[in-house]
């Protein structure tokens, strides 16, 4: 049997007042997701250990069977591996966002979802100013980049998406790398202030990328191969470096899809078709990750989150029509509209294709929590359980 796990990043939510106390999953029209839940078996899963912050890095690693307490080093390290960045044993890689700071507050953790081309121009100017510090900047997709610090010692940092609307001073880096990271941030603010890219963005009514925000730095992770753990060849389809970093560390195939953006305008159907085609080859398992639902949660947009769920559901429908195997559906964590950031609450999952069913009628948080026959499953046990046919 072959297996496909469809993951809507941040898709789970809390009751929303604007929706009459319902969640986006309860309001969205999603007949295909509901079919998986209705005809299959369901359960709840805690994807983030109490010892870790509720990030997509930790949650996705955990779902794939890797204990974050044992294998996780940092988000920056995973994204650096994905980008093929030279990574020595004494180096630390930090995730590095372009952000918008206004009146000393974190206005926008994604700098208006700056384009990758604009980001490259900003980084080229900043790298020139930082050339004497030995630091290397590697532009990624949109606002997501990597800062490589040779000889780094570590720093306590805060994810910028967790502090939107708050003063940044209490959340500046602390620890051994703090002074140098803060220096880089100050220099970036100076370099970006009158940069042509930002002048054009401001003129167009867009948020400028007026500073960098380094966070989640760590050493290169050492993880066992997915094929050795499970005896199956795995592949990952995504649009973000984080997921590709996990895949490369785990020895899984990386499948990139034209038109997959990691944002609301991603090519949902293109990803679904790529998943089906990949499973026609020698891959036994495909992990299909969609970021758009998470981005909508961070924006606090009920409309966009419902739209993202419904567009993902169309892709799920294509998969159900064209793939005859085991299909799993779940989020990695909630990204509640009201909070605009991740939480560590358990998430609902559904499995179709292993036989058996329960009393669940629709794919929603409440329905599955009340009626799912799997109960509460440990995230690192999911694939072992599914591959064993349970």
Predicted features and spans:
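Feature captures the catalytic ectodomains and active-site-proximal regions of enzymes
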Residues: 1-390
